[in-house]
Amino acid sequence: DVGSAGDSDSIQITINVGEFNNIRHLTANRDLQIFTTTSELYIPSFADKGLTPTNTQIPRQTPYGASFVKPLPFDGATLYVQKTGKTIREYLFSDKESAYVSTPLSLISSHLISNPIQMASVKGAFDRPEQYAFIINDDGSMAVFHSIRNEEKAGFVKWSTTGRYHSVVAIDD
């Protein structure tokens, strides 16, 4: 009986967003984030206790949907490809809204995003605060997103090669 679950039982919960959804990704960042075909949701985490059947809730946050490309924790947020394959979004908790927001990062650089197939990132370091996200498109091109959040600097650039990019991996120091 799911209704009488104890804290040590499995979590079985229905995500009630009014439409059929397939979960595409679970990402651990500030909270456990859920990216589906039509929505972005999260399971709030608690500093003093773990997730249990008695304290789990899943509020819907944004209505965009995610592609099959794995989301990336990036510069305090989570980057993901919107289900259309044309937009890179930043899923970030807004204290002002008391909710997660999904800001389109690639809006003015949409010509650099074409059905991404893979993403990787290099985190900042003590001597290098900037972070980079490498986005491989299905046409073999690569877009690179650069961000320094605390200085409010960010932007996309196209990386060119004589051939095509097939895959990308980032190895931090």
Task: Tell me the role of every PLM-derived stretch.
Residues D1-P129, V144-I171:
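Beta-propeller and closely related beta-pinwheel folds
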Residues D127-S141:
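Charge-patterned, long linear interaction tracts outside catalytic cores
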